[in-house]
Curated annotation (Swiss-Prot):
Name assigned to this protein: Collagen alpha-1(XVII) chain
Gene source species: Gallus gallus (Chicken)
Compositionally biased region (Pro residues): 786-807, 871-886, 901-910, 946-955, 981-993, 1167-1179, 1208-1218, 1257-1269, 1403-1413
Keyword Transport: no
GO cellular component: basement membrane; collagen trimer; collagen-containing extracellular matrix; extracellular space; hemidesmosome; membrane
Alphabetical keyword list: Basement membrane, Cell junction, Collagen, Disulfide bond, Extracellular matrix, Glycoprotein, Hydroxylation, Membrane, Phosphoprotein, Repeat, Secreted, Signal-anchor, Transmembrane, Transmembrane helix
Bias type Basic residues, positions: 1486-1495
Biased composition (Basic and acidic residues): 1-17, 1472-1481
Residues passing through the membrane, by range: 436-456
Region (Nonhelical region (NC1)): 1483-1495
Gene: COL17A1
Changes after translation: The intracellular/endo domain is disulfide-linked. Prolines at the third position of the tripeptide repeating unit (G-X-Y) are hydroxylated in some or all of the chains.
An MF annotation (GO) of this entry: extracellular matrix structural constituent conferring tensile strength
Length: 1495
């Protein structure tokens, strides 16, 4: 700004004005007290306004000293709103201008703006004249001309516009503009301004245009608060451009101004922001703003009308438009002028509006600008006068008088007319003030009246209430009189008179006394009635209402200015309108009048008396009304629906996200994603027998993963190759910690599958030991399943079974008999079981108690201990592991839970330690699941006949890696072949808690699994104990022999009678009798009996187990528990019974292998043997197994494509009578609401225990897997990675979608282990499953992990490239191929048939030995399956690294669904596989369920 600084007083506020082109200085005047006019002249040059403008103004950053005048409105009024000040506008230029128009004093400076001054002045005068003349018309055209003139002087142009509100202001503005101290300044200013404006207020570029108000205001404001100039006014911003500034405060832009009259000027008025309406007018944009404001305040109407409408629109657009131009143009006077004109136009309206303003003329307050100019005019009347100082002279003219305008026009000369100095607060302030005062007084008066009225009303109400009360009293008497009692009384009286005994109805003993009393009361009432009438008078109290005094105040309230107000004013303190006082009086009178009303009321009262009484009588009825409230209850109903059902359906997916949450719901589990993993396991479930293998628990390390194992997938494959299942579980095994899961022991039921015993071959595998760590999802993250597994050492024999897990389906495989040794495998169980068993086992144990148990005996796991292979755990994949035939281990029911006898051992649970089973790693070969054959499939269950033969599926190889299937272990869903034990489950009771209640059992199982002893079993099936012996005969607590027939009957009846769960089961079963028979046969089967009978003997604890069973073997209870367990496990019906050793799945492949080898399930493990310790097959082993584990396992096994996940289900081996396992259980499972199963499975998976397995750490992977839709074709497609990805993608999507999949899909990372493994398996499964995507789906379709792979894979294969599996079935396991085999196997068993997904899948046929499930190095290494799997995948590429991220894309995964087309999978029937099928079935159940959901 120029160095020159001036201080002037405007409105009593001191304005410091700096002149000079420099923008730095602002002149602000604060208006005092809000003269409304800011007077601020921010003169600083426009510069001030410029950028600094905003700052300055407000802060008065540079010289701008803006005091806010009291008038808060403007506070800065932004410089008087218009002050134009244009600050920007050159206010600097105008030296006085600062406010340029805003303050009259400045105005003169403004007028005298430097070079333009002369021109400005004349222009100003001209403008004023025009404005005034135009004002009426409201046409701003003239203003436009004026603006042009003003524009000539830049400031003029802008300012004027700004002034718009008051005509004067515009000129002022011009003056101000002129004021620009020099042309140069001006120019500079202009430029500067422009820039500044643009900068500051870019919105309106006006620099000068800004009408000061606007701009100014804006600037002002800007300075003030907004950054825009407007800011100061901020509201004022409203200034026109304030709009831009919008002054933030206010709402409309202009309006916003503080109402501030919008615009700066309005600002002044601003005070009255009230005019908010005006605001708009204020909007009027600077011009008139001031006026507007005032007007506004007063009226706002006027303003509104003209200013608001015109100005706003013109101003808004034009101003902005023009203003910008102005800024630009200002330098160019001519164009600028044009713009100015526009502004002027606006101004005119402002003027009009000003006129509108009430008393004030637009000029006076309305035009603050004018006003300021007028300020010279001291009185409001003077308001009309405007001051303008063209050359520093002020002109003041009454706004109203055109003459004044003319004056202004002419001379602008000096002195303001009516010259209260513009700075004189009275100029605008007084008026403004008076208005405020008047308004306040009026308000007070009104408030007084209001309060008076309120008081009056209150009084009346009180009187009324009193009257009512009296009436009520009277009525009560009257009523009584008239009412029954009295009437009766009368009657009585009459009777009495007649000699009739008084009626007893009347309460009073002495009727007469009553009557008298009534009478007296009535009399009193009458009296009261009169009183009541008197009371009515009290109504008079209304007088209080007078509050006359307030009324007086109110009068003052009327703004003195307005004549009326004035009157009141006098009356009020404002002596002025003393006369008005009379009116004030009237006001009170009015009140009295009202009071009078009450009086009348009084009169009516008396009459009312009688009537009222009657009415009173009527009143009573009212009461009834209340009852209505009851309705409320309705809402409660809603809870009923409670989602329970829902969860199941979506559950799978939903669970995903909710993983944990979902868990609660099983359905919610929706995330099944994790479940998905389990699902895999599920498939494994079939492998359940394999479960025994699980004992290898050592692999447990993967435990965590194990759960992930998802054996679910395997499960299907389980059919394929029970071993596979086991393997996976193996992985789970690692979770050793899982061991704690002890509960899973429950899986025991799976036990029956244990039969596979033959597998023994894996024996070697035992080594995994280390992993013992199996983490059990169960509570402890890592259960060191390892623990005992060691002992299982003997695993040797079982060895092969190793992984069979998956074989699950093979379940029946013949009696692995030898498998008993597998005992060790139990460990695996822990993982899976742990997780699954925990829940399943508890139930199952309680129900089946030991269901898995029997498998327990897996025979001395001996070898199974297999060292802790822990790491091996993952092997779980063993997946294919031939038909574990012996679901024995069936721990499988649980996902992981290797079916290992552990289940029943459950209690043996103490073994809890699954810990080590890890080593079980090798599921050995699940070999012949043999047992599984039994599949409870429901009617289909053909008992599978002991697939026995399948047993040796031969190397089936643990491929079992499928481990994942683990879950399937028990076929929790029921779909799953329940894998293993399920069948036996029933009686397993003896094992351990057996007798206990489900929860107890669950506890036992958990404890057992967790305990070292059990862990051994679970892990290694430890079972060295070999079949506990109890197996032989189950004895009930009462000492009776266990009657299998009874058990079968009960189970059947329970199943059939139990809710829908089983209905479907029943339906699926051709006939209940068939199922029953099958079940009975299964139960009686040696393998199964072992399960049922006791915990697999080996379980050591079994003894206790036996006790448990012996506690009291209530067949009904047992059955119930068994089923409940299965159901809770997600198996629809555990019935399937043996189905499947597959159970594994909880165990890592190694565990399974070891377990199976050691257990009677060795056969089950069977072929898996080759799978060798599929090693960590990773996931499959148990849900615990992570994808990576699975991946590793798979790779080791050769399923590179599926990367461990599936773990090679291991060729189901010749599951032997597939019929039994796969179909029966599967069917049954299918029947049993796959959804339910899925939900349960999901829930289970979601449960913390399981989740730890499954999810394990979500696994870093976050599977990138989703990589792409690939899932669709990729599905299993060639590589695990693709599969995995696909699955991840789809799954993730799917599940992920699900969220899916919850942890699984979504996190893949989270789910990662489980998710991952699930993912891959799921992926395939998912693909096939499609939406199901989640574990459940995978399980749903395959049931076991394997199954999953199987169906899925097969599906995939068929759908997508069949790719490796089929090609290299013998060689590396191609999951696709494997899936196909498994699917075929399952189908052959009839298992898949139920699955929607694979309708046609031919039985996967033995998956073919998956080849050693390949231990998941990772899995085995740690319990963290997820991590392992992820690592594995990453390492091998199977998992695309964390594809997880990508995973999202996975949605394509759903494409996978098409996979189901897989039917082709039918492949020749792997008939034998069926055994595995058992396992598979269990898994199936779960998986399938999922699948169906998915589907």
């Amino acid at each position: 700004m120029d160095s020159v600084t001036k201080k002037t007083r405007q409105d009593g506020s001191e304005v410091t004005e700096r002149q000079g082109g420099s923008s730095s200085g602002l002149k602000t005047s604060s208006h005092t007290g809000g003269s409304g006019v800011e007077k601020r002249s921010y003169t600083h040059s426009s510069g001030y306004v410029t950028s600094s403008g905003s700052g300055r103004l407000n802060s008065s950053s540079s010289g701008y000293r803006q005091t806010q005048s009291p008038s808060s409105t403007l506070t800065k009024s932004p410089g008087s709103t218009f002050e134009r000040k244009t600050y920007v506008n050159r206010h600097a230029t105008y030296e006085g201008s600062s406010s340029a128009n805003s303050s009259p004093e400045f105005p003169r400076k403004e007028f005298a703006s430097a070079s333009t001054r002369g021109r400005s002045q004349s222009r100003e005068s001209e403008i004023r004249v025009r404005l005034q003349s135009a004002s009426p018309s409201g046409r701003w055209t003239e203003l436009d001309d004026v603006k042009r003139l003003l524009k000539g002087s830049r400031s003029a142009s802008c300012s004027p516009t700004r002034s718009s509100s008051s005509t004067l202001p515009i000129p002022k503005k011009a003056v101000v503009e002129t004021k620009m101290v020099t042309e140069s300044s001006q120019s500079v200013s202009g430029t500067y301004d422009t820039t500044i404006l643009n900068t500051t207020l870019p919105p309106y570029t006006w620099s000068s245009t800004l009408p000061a108000g606007s701009s100014l205001g804006g600037y002002h404001n800007s300075m003030g608060q907004s950054s825009s100039l407007i800011n100061a006014m901020s509201h004022s911003t409203g200034s026109v451009f304030g709009v831009p500034n919008n002054l933030a405060p206010s709402s409309h832009a202009l309006n916003t101004g503080l109402s501030t009259s919008s615009t700066v000027f309005g600002v002044q008025n601003n005070l009255s922001p009230s005019s908010s309406a005006l605001n708009a007018s204020a909007a009027s944009a600077a011009y008139g703003m001031k006026n507007t404001s005032q007007t506004n305040t007063m009226n706002s109407t006027g303003v509104s009308a003209s200013a608001g409408g015109t100005i706003l629109s013109s101003q808004g657009d034009d101003f902005l438009h023009k203003d910008c131009k102005f800024l630009l143009l200002e330098k160019e006077n001519a164009p600028a002028k044009k713009e100015m004109e526009l502004l002027v136009m606006t101004k005119d309206s402002g003027k009009v509006f000003s006129a509108s303003s009430t008393g004030l003329n637009g000029g006076s307050f309305a035009e603050d600008t004018l006003k300021k100019e007028k300020q010279g005019l001291s009185s409001y009347a003077a308001d009309t006068g405007l001051k303008s100082d063209a050359n520093g002279g002020l002109k003041s003219a009454p706004t109203r008088d055109k003459a004044t305008y003319a004056e202004i026009q002419n001379g602008g000369a000096g002195g303001a007319i009516g010259s209260a100095p513009s700075w004189c607060p009275c100029g605008s302030c007084c008026s403004w003030w008076k208005w405020l005062l008047g308004l306040l007084l009026a308000w007070l008066l009104l408030l007084g009246l209001l309060f008076g009225l309120i008081a009056l009303a209150e009084e009346v109400r009180k009187l009324k209430s009193r009257v009512d009360n009296l009436e009520k009293i009277n009525h009560s008497f009257l009523t009584v009189n008239q009412g029954n009692p009295y009437l009766e009384k009368d009657v009585s009286k009459v009777d009495f008179l007649h000699g009739v005994a008084p009626s007893s109805t009347f309460p009073f003993e002495n009727e007469e006394s009553v009557w008298l009393m009534v009478k007296s009361r009535l009399n009193k009432e009458i009296e009261r009635g009169y009183f009541r009438g008197e009371r009515g008078e009290p109504g008079m109290k209304g007088d209080m209402g007078l509050q006359g005094p307030k009324g007086d105040r109110g009068l003052p309230g009327v703004p003195g200015i307005p004549g009326p107000v004035g009157h009141q004013g006098p009356e009020g303190p404002k002596g002025q309108k003393g006369s008005m006082g009379d009116p004030g009086m009237e006001g009170p009178m009015g009140q009295r009048g009202r009071e009078g009303l009450p009086g009348p009321r009084g009169e009516p009262g008396p009459p009312g008396f009688g009537e009222k009484g009657d009415r009173g009588a009527a009143g009573p009825p009212g009461p009834p009304g209340p009852p209505g409230s009851a309705g409320l209850k309705g809402p409660m109903g809603s809870p009923g629906p409670q989602g329970p059902p829902g969860p199941p359906g979506l559950q799978g997916f939903r669970g995903e996200a909710g993983l944990p949450g979902a868990k609660g719901e099983k359905g919610a589990t929706g995330p099944p994603g994790p479940k998905g993993d389990q699902g895999e396991k599920g498939a494994r479930g079939m492998t359940g027998e394999q479960g025994s293998r699980g004992i290898p628990g050592p692999p447990g390390e993967p435990g965590a993963k194990g759960p992930a194992g998802q054996a679910g997938r395997d499960g299907q494959p389980g059919e394929r190759g029970e071993p596979g299942l086991m393997g996976m579980p193996g992985a789970r095994g690692p979770p050793g910690p899982s061991g704690d899961t002890g509960e899973p022991g429950l899986t025991g039921p799976q036990g029956p599958p244990g039969l596979p015993g033959n597998p023994g071959r894996p024996g070697a595998k035992g080594e995994p030991g280390a992993p013992g760590k199996v983490i059990s999802a169960e509570g402890s993250s890592t259960i060191a399943l390892p623990g005992p597994p060691g002992p299982p050492g003997p695993i040797g024999p079982t060895g092969p079974p190793g992984v069979p897990g998956p074989v699950g389906p093979a379940g029946l495989p013949g009696q692995q008999g030898p498998r008993g040794e597998k005992g060790s495998a139990g460990e695996v169980v822990i993982e899976t079981i742990k997780t699954e068993v925990s829940s399943l086992a508890s139930q199952m144990l309680s129900d089946l108690q030991g269901r898995a148990g029997p498998p327990g005996p897996p025979g001395p796991p001996g070898e199974s201990v297999q060292g802790l292979p822990g790491p091996r755990g993952p092997p779980g994949l063993p997946g294919p592991s031939g038909p574990p035939g012996r679901p024995g281990s069936s721990v499988s029911t649980s996902e992981t839970f290797v079916s290992g006898p552990p289940g029943p051992p459950g209690p043996p649970g103490p073994k809890g330690d699954q810990g080590e089973p890890g080593p079980r790693g090798f599921t050995g070969e699940p070999g012949e699941p043999g047992l599984p054959g039994f599949s409870s499939h429901g009617g289909t269950v053909t008992m599978q006949g002991p697939p026995g033969p399948p047993g040796p599926p031969g190397p089936k190889g643990d491929a079992g890696v499928p481990g994942a299937p683990g879950i399937p272990g028990t076929s929790r869903g029921g779909s799953r072949q329940i894998q293993g034990p399920p069948g036996p489950p029933g009686p397993p009771g003896p094992p351990g808690p057996g007798g206990s209640s489900s929860q107890e059992i669950q506890q036992y199982v958990a404890d057992y699994l967790k305990s070292d002893n059990v862990r051994h079993y679970l892990t290694g099936v430890q079972g060295p104990p070999g079949p506990p012996g109890p197996p032989g005969i189950l004895t009930t607590a009462d000492g009776k022999n266990f009657d299998f027939a009874e058990l079968a009957t009960r189970v059947m009846s329970y199943v059939t009678s139990s809710s829908d769960h089983y209905q479907s089961f029943a339906s699926s079963v051709s006939t209940t009798s068939v199922l029953y028979q099958e079940l009975l046969n299964m139960l009686q089967r040696e393998e199964i009996r072992q399960y049922l009978v006791g915990p697999r003997g080996p379980p050591g604890p079994p003894g206790p187990g036996v006790d448990g069973m012996s506690l009291s073997l209530d067949y009904d209870e047992l059955t119930r528990r068994f089923i409940s367990y299965l159901t809770s496990s997600g198996m629809s019906i555990g019935l399937p019974g043996p189905p499947g050793p597959p159970g594994t799945p909880g165990i890592s492949y190694s565990e399974l292998t070891a377990y199976l080898r050691n257990s009677e399930f060795s056969g089950l493990v069977g072929p898996p043997g080759p799978a060798g310790p599929p090693g960590p097959p990773g996931i499959p082993g148990s849900s615990g197994i992570s994808l990576e584990d699975i991946s590793a396992y798979l790779q080791s096994v050769g399923y590179s494509s599926i990367s461990g996940i599936q773990g090679p289900p291991g060729p189901p081996g010749p599951p032997g009578p597939p019929g039994f396992s796969g179909t029966g259980l599967l069917s049954y499972a299918d029947i049993t609401h796959s959804d339910e199963f899925r939900s349960e499975l999901i829930q289970y998976l979601k449960s913390d225990e399981v989740r730890s397995y499954i999810s394990g750490p979500p696994g870093p992977p976050g599977p990138r897997g989703p990589p792409g839709p690939k899932g669709d074709s990729g599905l299993v497609a060639g590589s695990m990675s693709s599969l995995y990805h696909d699955s991840l993608a789809s799954e993730r999507l799917h599940g992920g979608s699900i969220g899916a999949e919850g942890s699984h899909g979504g996190s893949l990372g989270a789910s990662s282990s489980y998710g991952s493994s699930m993912s891959s398996s799921m992926s395939s499964y998912s693909a096939s499953m499609g939406s199901d995507g989640s574990y459940g789906a995978s399980v749903g379709s395959d049931g076991s992990f394997d199954g999953l792979l199987t169906a899925e894979e097969s599906h995939r294969r068929s759908a997508g490239p069949g790719r490796s599996y089929s090609s290299s079935f013998t060689g590396s396991l191609d999951y696709n191929e494997l899936a196909r085999h498994v699917s075929e196997n399952l189908q052959s068993r009839g298992i898949l048939q139920d699955l929607m997904s694979y309708t046609g899948q031919g039985p996967p046929g033995p998956p073919g030995p998956p080849g050693p499930p390949g231990i998941s190095r990772v899995f085995a290494a740690y319990g963290n399956v997820t991590e392992d799997l992820m690592d594995f995948f990453r390492t091998h590429g199977t998992v695309r690294g964390p594809p997880g991220e990508k995973g999202e894309r996975g949605y394509p995964g759903p494409k996978g669904d098409p996979g189901p087309m897989g039917p082709p999978g039918r492949h020749g029937q792997r008939g034998p596989k069926g055994e595995k099928g058992e396992k598979g079935e269990q898994m199936y159940s779960g998986r399938r369920r999922r699948r169906s959901v998915g589907v």
